[in-house]
């Protein structure tokens, strides 16, 4: 908000001093031709006349014509010709000295000798207080020759205080009146410009004077003084003490023209920061600066009779005032063609924004009516007349401060407390109005306000209900944007992992994933463009704006504030809902990232280990995830099957079967890949080879059901958070590094089992147990015991990989699909638990046993370590019995 403003120029004419009154010409009839020489030399000190005459409150006359002019003209007509010539010559000489110029000047306000300090304050500084409280900068400075009353106008005395005291007194009174609505922060600084150096007046001078301060321009292009003392007074008494301390430190010395001459320019700056107590989410702080400047007076060396350092001080004072006059001349140009020399002096740099910037400025011109200061008064009036043409662009200083999210709840609580306090006040007003029967009009008006307030609350409630669909739509859009962010995050992670771990593979599909990512970003931007909660806020405000305006017109500002607080409370509720939607925690994305991380690590290990089939299947599954497809879990289950169409070249060499390493290579805390369960696939015990090996192969199927390993899916672990890295088997220890132990039975679970001697062309997954025992031992047991074992139905847990059918990267959530159950395919198949007791009672020689085992579909081991130990003990016992 900007306003065009002009500098307000006022003129104050001081009264004659005692010495000047003694030499003042009392009446004009004392003048004669013989005394005209004293008038031609107005500074002679003997005869003094008035050179400034105030006509009214806005116009004054400089060097008015004397009242005896008409009398002299009439007298000249009675003189002889030679005497008339002498009189004309005398008047001509007087006019050349400035006698009777009759120059008229008009200003915003003119004060004569009888004006008091209070009158000057009422017409100059008091109007600026409204601007200060509204956030506009203001400046008051006194300008004039030495001894013309500038310091008296600005500072005054204890009996007759000046503008500083009167201005700050009323400022504190207004602040106390507004403390219920606003929070104020007032800071005060006081400095002087002495011989073009800046001194801090609030710091007592010391023998080792500190380094002078410098002027700086901040980021907002405001002139500041780094290192200047800034105080925060809490009362008017503290301000008076501060001003008196600063005036005591100011440089002053007597001269011939003024007994208490100021030898420096004094600048008092008052900075006021204010903020409303009921500020919304975005707080607006108002900042305003009031500058009160007492300039040193211009002086002539011949009049002041200065020598030495005082002469040097006067030269610097005149230099700075000359720079100020040049700036005024340049600013008066309506086209601003001339450069404004602000940097010619520190005074003009300090007054830069007061003269031509963001500030309301009042210039108080102090002049002397005595002819002793004839030339100084004339020049001062000329500069003041030019300063009227200076235009300034005034802007309100607002500082926007965003509140933290944690302050929303606090703001709501404060608003509710204020509403309760206002309601209590209203209740007290109602009680007092009812008790005082004489004030019936106030009671009636209060009831009318209450009814309007109830009506406004109903309107707000209806508006809130009407905007519920719009509120829900906004919140849904915010949640959708949050879901898009999660999907974009997963896709970016997928791309980074895929390009790093699987380079140069499926470039076309990677391009499709990038296209999908760009599509998600575009759709997200479109949704964000449609989110506009301000529509809801505007509906709330418009629904009760007419009632608020009515309250303000009737002077019921309290009711207007209560209603506005309720509107702000509704806005805060909507904003909190939007923030909750933005900060909603989604547990799906971290789980999916963890799954992708494990899958990519597993694919890298599979590729390095030469397991090309598993690598291809896992790569296919990862590509499906990146393209947003819904991959079936059977894709991963294929990794546990062997290709039934493989040729003889894929037969595994029996001599290359290795045992487990003596020390586990993986962490024992990691989840196991398989649980030991009852068998559900046919198991055939083949004849022992010459190397005394025992083979359990589920590839032989001789049962009537004809169940095959190719027709039933392989069960896997049921761990929900299983990743492929934890399920990979590390390579076994080489044969030449293994310790020789004749009593050790090595067990190794292979994804591709060795070829059965009964079925050479059909490799199947199975369990290979090899023993280095020299002699084959057979276990004698009854077939009935084995039949009982085969009839037992051990409870097995259904296991499945984590479901990935719920993964959808299209930007919309998908309902969870129930877990697959692969145990139903073999529900009717008998189960068999191969544990210690079963091995002890097992008879491999009976055909019935083979027939029963061939009908099984799956072989589960309860504990392989126990089986190994039990087998060793059984073999040793049988060998002892045989010997």
From Swiss-Prot:
InterPro entries: Kinesin-like_fam, Kinesin_motor_CS, Kinesin_motor_dom, Kinesin_motor_dom_sf, P-loop_NTPase. It is found in: Cytoplasm; Cytoplasm, Cytoskeleton; Chromosome, Centromere, Kinetochore; Cytoplasm, Cytoskeleton, Spindle. Residues 755-785 are annotated as: Disordered. PROSITE patterns: KINESIN_MOTOR_1, KINESIN_MOTOR_2. One of its GO terms (molecular function) is microtubule binding. Disruption phenotype: Simultaneous disruption of dam1 is lethal and leads to the cut phenotype (septation without chromosome segregation). GO terms for cellular component: cortical microtubule; cytoplasm; cytosol; kinesin complex; kinesin I complex; kinetochore; microtubule cytoskeleton; mitotic spindle. Residues 396-435, 563-588 form a coiled coil. Pfam families: Kinesin. The keyword Methyltransferase does not apply. PANTHER family: CENTROMERE PROTEIN E, KINESIN-LIKE PROTEIN KIF19 ISOFORM X1. Belongs to the TRAFAC class myosin-kinesin ATPase superfamily. Kinesin family. Kinesin II subfamily. Has a role in establishing metaphase during mitosis. Required for chromosome segregation where it generates tension during kinetochore capturing. This is Kinesin-like protein 5. It comes from Schizosaccharomyces pombe (strain 972 / ATCC 24843) (Fission yeast).
């Amino acid at each position: 908000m900007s306003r065009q403003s002009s500098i307000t120029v006022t003129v104050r004419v001081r009264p004659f001093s005692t010495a000047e009154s003694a030499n003042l010409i009392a009446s004009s009839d004392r003048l004669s031709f013989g005394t005209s020489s004293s008038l031609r030399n107005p500074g002679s000190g003997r005869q003094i006349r008035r050179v400034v005459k105030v006509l009214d409150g806005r116009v004054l006359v400089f060097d008015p014509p004397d009242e005896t002019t008409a009398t002299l003209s009439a007298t000249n007509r009675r003189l002889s010709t030679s005497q008339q010539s002498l009189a004309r010559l005398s008047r001509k000489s007087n006019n050349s000295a400035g006698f009777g110029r009759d120059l008229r000047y008009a200003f915003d306000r003119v004060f004569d000798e009888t004006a008091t300090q209070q009158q000057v304050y009422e017409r100059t500084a008091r109007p600026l207080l409204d601007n200060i409280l509204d956030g506009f900068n203001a400046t008051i400075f006194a300008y004039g020759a030495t001894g013309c009353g500038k310091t008296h106008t600005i500072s005054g005395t204890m009996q007759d205080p000046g503008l500083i005291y009167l201005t700050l007194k009323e400022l504190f009174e207004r602040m106390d009146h507004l403390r219920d609505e606003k929070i104020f922060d007032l800071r005060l600084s006081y400095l002087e410009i002495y011989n073009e150096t800046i001194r801090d007046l609030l710091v007592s001078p010391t023998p080792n004077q500190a380094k002078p301060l410098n002027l700086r321009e901040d980021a907002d292009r405001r002139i500041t003084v780094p290192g200047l003392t800034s105080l925060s007074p809490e009362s008017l008494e503290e301000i008076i003490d501060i001003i008196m301390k600063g005036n005591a430190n100011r440089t002053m010395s007597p001269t011939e023209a003024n007994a208490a001459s100021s030898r420096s320019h004094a600048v008092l700056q008052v900075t006021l920061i204010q903020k409303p107590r009921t500020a919304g989410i975005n707080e607006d702080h108002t900042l305003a600066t009031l500058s009160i400047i007492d300039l040193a007076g211009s002086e002539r060396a011949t009049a002041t009779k200065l020598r030495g350092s005082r002469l040097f001080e006067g030269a610097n004072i005149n230099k700075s005032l000359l720079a100020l006059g040049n700036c005024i001349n340049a600013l008066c140009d309506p086209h601003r063609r001339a450069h404004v020399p602000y940097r010619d002096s520190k005074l003009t740099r300090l007054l830069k924004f007061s003269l031509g910037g963001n500030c309301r400025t009042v210039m108080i011109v102090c002049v002397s009516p005595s002819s002793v200061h004839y030339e100084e008064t004339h020049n001062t009036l000329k500069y003041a007349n030019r300063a009227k043409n200076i235009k300034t662009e005034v802007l309100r200083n607002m500082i926007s401060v965003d509140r933290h999210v944690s302050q929303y709840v606090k703001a709501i609580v404060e608003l509710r407390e204020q509403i309760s306090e206002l309601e209590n006040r209203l209740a007290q007003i109602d009680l007092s109005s009812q008790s005082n029967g004489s004030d019936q009009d106030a009671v009636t008006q209060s009831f009318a306000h209450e009814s309007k307030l109830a009506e406004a609350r109903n309107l707000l409630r209806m508006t809130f209900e009407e905007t519920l669909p719009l509120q829900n739509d906004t919140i849904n859009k915010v949640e959708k944007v949050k879901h898009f962010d999660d999907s974009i995050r997963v896709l970016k992670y997928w791309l980074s992992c895929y390009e790093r771990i699987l380079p140069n593979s499926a470039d076309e599909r990677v391009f499709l994933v990038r296209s999908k990512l760009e599509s998600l970003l575009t759709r997200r931007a479109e949704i964000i463009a449609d989110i506009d909660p301000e529509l809801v806020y505007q509906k709330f405000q418009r629904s009760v704006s007419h009632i608020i305006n009515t309250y303000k017109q009737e002077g019921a500002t309290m009711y207007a504030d209560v209603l506005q607080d309720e509107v702000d409370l509704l806005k805060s509720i909507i904003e909190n809902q939007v923030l909750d939607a933005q900060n909603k925690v989604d547990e799906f994305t971290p789980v999916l990232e963890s799954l992708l991380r494990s899958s990519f690590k597993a694919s890298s290990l599979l590729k390095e280990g030469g397991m090309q089939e598993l690598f291809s299947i896992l790569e296919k599954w990862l590509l499906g995830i990146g393209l947003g497809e819904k991959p079936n879990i059977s894709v991963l289950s294929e990794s546990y099957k062997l290709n039934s169409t493989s040729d003889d070249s894929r037969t595994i060499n029996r001599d290359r079967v290795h045992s487990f390493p003596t020390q586990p290579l993986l962490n024992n805390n990691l989840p196991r890949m398989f649980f030991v369960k009852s068998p559900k696939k046919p198991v055939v015990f083949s004849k022992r080879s010459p190397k005394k090996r025992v083979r359990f192969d589920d590839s032989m199927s001789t049962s009537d059901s004809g169940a095959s390993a190719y027709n039933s899916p392989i069960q896997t672990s049921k761990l929900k958070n299983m990743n492929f890295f934890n399920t990979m088997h590390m390579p076994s220890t080489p044969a030449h590094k293994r310790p020789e132990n004749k009593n050790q039975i090595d067990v190794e679970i292979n994804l591709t089992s060795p070829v059965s001697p009964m079925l050479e062309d059909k490799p199947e997954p199975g369990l290979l147990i090899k023993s280095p025992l020299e002699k084959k031992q057979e276990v004698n047991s009854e077939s009935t015991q084995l039949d009982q074992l085969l009839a037992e139905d051990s409870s097995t847990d259904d296991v499945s990989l984590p479901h990935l059918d719920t993964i959808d990267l299209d930007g919309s959530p998908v309902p969870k699909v129930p877990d697959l159950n692969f145990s139903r395919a073999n529900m009717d198949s008998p189960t068999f638990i191969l544990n210690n007791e079963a091995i002890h009672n097992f008879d491999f020689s009976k055909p019935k046993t083979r027939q029963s085992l061939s009908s099984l579909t799956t072989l589960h081991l309860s504990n392989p370590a126990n089986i190994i130990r039990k087998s060793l003990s059984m073999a040793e016992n049988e060998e002892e019995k045989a010997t």
